[in-house]
Regions:
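Nucleic-acid substrate recognition interfaces
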Residues: 1-225
Length: 225
């Protein structure tokens, strides 16, 4: 059986443009949501998810063989390609969810509140390896992220919490981690890494097994039984 574990590494306080990067990424997602809701009927006719994504990207990104219909490249110049595609994917998911909820609402004769399309979002960027994320020197509590400084996208060295890095080196050394996702909790920023591993399930009869369940309450602490 394959399981996925994740761990957040805190970014130490320093003068790096994390907030600016997050703001421009979320602005890009909001802008794309506004575009895709306008052309959703056209996009919805494409059943294949990959082809739909490609069509959505062609609408906003100009290449030698394609002229974009919208001015995304002008509004968000030099945005790294992987980050742009991440924003497109998030926007498509948001509009698709909204349209699905709207269809269900219409089928129920509008008995409940009409769904609203929310442009403000809490999307968090993924720092894809090599193009947006590079590991620091072996044994160093640091990494390199491509961040937006208000004018351009540049590589910045970020210091990582020593205790968190020691845990990763001790428990996950040699295992491949996914591209880290930026996370914000209690006014602090983290890079969340995910790890895949294979585990062998026990052959003990179900009635003889000890089961641990965790109830993650919305307004209460977790309850374990």
């Amino acid at each position: 059986m394959q399981i996925i574990s994740s761990y957040g590494v805190e970014l130490r306080k320093q003068n790096i443009p994390i907030r600016q990067t997050l703001e421009i990424y979320r602005s890009a997602v909001s802008y794309l949501i506004g575009i895709y809701v306008q052309v959703w009927e056209e996009l919805a006719e494409i059943p294949d998810a990959k082809r739909r994504f490609n069509a959505a990207e062609h609408l906003v990104h100009t290449t030698k063989k394609n002229h974009a219909c919208f001015d995304f490249d002008i509004r968000f110049p030099k945005m790294p390609s992987y980050l742009r595609r991440s924003a497109i994917q998030h926007a498509l998911g948001t509009v698709s969810s909204y349209k699905t909820r709207l269809d269900l609402w219409e089928k129920t004769d509008g008995k409940s509140g009409k769904p609203k399309l929310v442009y403000e979002n809490h999307a968090m960027p993924v720092f894809y390896r090599d193009v947006m994320y590079r590991e620091g020197a072996e044994g160093k509590d640091e990494a390199y992220l491509k961040l937006y400084d208000g004018h351009d996208w540049k590589w910045s060295c970020v210091r990582l919490d020593h205790t968190d890095m020691e845990y990763l080196r001790k428990c996950w050394s040699g295992k491949k981690a996914s591209a880290p996702t930026l996370e914000k909790r209690h006014r602090k920023y983290f890079l969340r890494f995910s790890y895949k591993e294979e585990v062998t399930l026990t052959k003990t009869p179900v009635k003889e097994q000890i089961i641990c369940s965790v109830d993650l309450g919305i307004n209460t602490d977790a309850v374990c039984t």
